[in-house]
Regions:
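Domain-level detector of nuclease and nuclease-like folds
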Residues: 95-224
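Secreted/periplasmic proteins that engage bacterial cell-wall peptidoglycan
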Residues: 31-113, 117-119
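N-terminal module-boundary/linker segments of secreted carbohydrate-active enzymes
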Residues: 1-64, 194-196, 205-224
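Residue-level detector of functional hotspots within protein domains
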Residues: 7-12, 21-24, 77, 86, ...
Length: 224
């Protein structure tokens, strides 16, 4: 299958998350073979006007690394070094409910990681392999698909989809998490597996009226 054009990522319109889920194609996972995070989705968090400068987002292409943009959006009590670098802040982790005090440093920064809600390995297996490299880089740096999260706890997720991993129920984030996954798969024309659809339907069925997030939703849009 030929690579799709760089402009394939569609703009999404707000509507029912359950309705959008019903429109996603259902297929088995493709093979993970050939997947290489850097070669296929670009290097993580590089600076400047390149691929890792929050593409497709309000406030993106601002010269700041994607990681700093997401930290600034999701943390409170943020302190900056210069215009971009987040030196410290507080994360109320949406996936575990824990409060984490973030301090930038070689040993301390991994306490907070940037989680792709649709894991890049999963994206590769469900259609991203056929996307052009620029669109895959956009996916990897799209704020719609990214959230700051507890680093060690996020290790458990790996490349699982919603049928294999979800945020802790007590944290109250599952509805938003799954709705964001549906939005990302809609935007980038990715498919879901039958088990994934069952898991997503179960979650969204418990939060009827959940609106599909868009690039301008308050939980997605970057801070200016």
């Amino acid at each position: 299958m030929p690579a799709r054009s760089a402009g394939v990522a569609r703009s999404i319109s707000s509507g029912s998350a359950l309705g959008a889920l019903a429109k996603l194609a259902v297929k088995p996972d493709g093979p993970i073979s050939g997947y290489d995070r850097i070669a296929d989705f670009g290097a993580a968090w590089t600076d400047g006007q390149g691929a890792s400068d929050c593409q497709g987002a309000s406030g993106g292409h601002n010269g700041c690394e994607t990681r700093d943009d997401i930290l600034r959006r999701d943390l409170t009590e943020v302190k900056l070094e210069g215009r971009c670098e987040v030196e410290s802040g507080v994360l109320k982790d949406p996936c575990t409910g824990r409060t984490i005090r973030f301090t930038r440093g070689r040993k301390t920064s991994p306490a907070v990681r940037i989680d792709p809600m649709v894991a890049l390995g999963n994206a590769w297996q469900t259609g991203a392999k056929a996307l052009s490299k620029p669109v895959r880089e956009q996916l990897a740096n799209d704020p719609l698909n990214l959230t700051a999260a507890d680093g060690p706890a996020n290790d458990d997720k790996g490349d699982d989809d919603a049928s294999g991993w979800l945020p802790q129920a007590a944290a109250g984030f599952r509805c938003e998490y799954v709705a964001r996954q549906v939005a990302v798969k809609t935007k980038y024309k990715l498919w879901i597996t039958s088990a994934e659809k069952i898991a997503m339907s179960r979650i969204l069925g418990g939060c009827r009226g959940r609106v599909l997030p868009t690039e301008s939703s308050h939980e997605v849009a970057l801070k200016s």
